[in-house]
Amino acid sequence: MPGPDASLPDLVLRRLAISEQVAAAKFGAGRPVDDPVREQRELARVRVLAREIGLDPDLAAGFLSDQIAASKQVQHRLFTHWSAHPGDLPEGGPDLSVLRAELDGLTVALLDRLAATGSEALEPPESPDELQEPLRTAFRTLTRQRPAPGGSGNGP
């Protein structure tokens, strides 16, 4: 679980990094990426949590909706890759319920951090240069140990 000093971008990256494991669990179980019932339930839960901590429920739900959309993009890309290259699917897929519990904990941490930093944390940076390191970190997170298309799956 993230520490109390984890930054908002760090928490977003941690949540996004779990997307690959979620995709593997869903793909291995024959479940679709999209789960609109769970998504709506999570957005409703976030609205309640936001009210409890004094955060605008619409801001919180919009923020989580963006996190869900980013995760689904990663999952769809992996589903496409694994459909074409089934040998690249990680063996022994993770338990989706365990991953969802981890995501739920990250959601609470994200909301707490968002409430602590305020909505200005969601404002675009003044300079594109401010995005360089977070983007490099996100790229490394999403490509770490990822096989090249048609690769063996034995990344560095």
Give the residues covered by each predicted segment.
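A structural signal for well-ordered alpha-helices, especially hydrophobic packing surfaces
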Residues: 19, 50, 71, 75, ...
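Immediate post-signal-peptide N-terminus of mature secreted/exported proteins
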Residues: 1-32
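Glycine-rich, aromatic-bearing surface loops/beta-hairpins
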Residues: 114-156
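Mid-length scaffold segments of soluble, non-membrane domains
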Residues: 53-82
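Acidic helix-start/capping segments at beta-turn-to-alpha-helix junctions
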Residues: 36-46, 63-71
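Acidic/histidine-rich alpha-helical segments that form the ligand environment
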Residues: 90-118
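Second-shell loop/turn segments in exported
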Residues: 5-8, 28-36, 48-53, 89, ...
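Secondary-structure edge/capping motif, primarily at the C-terminal ends of alpha-helices
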Residues: 25-30, 78, 85, 117, ...
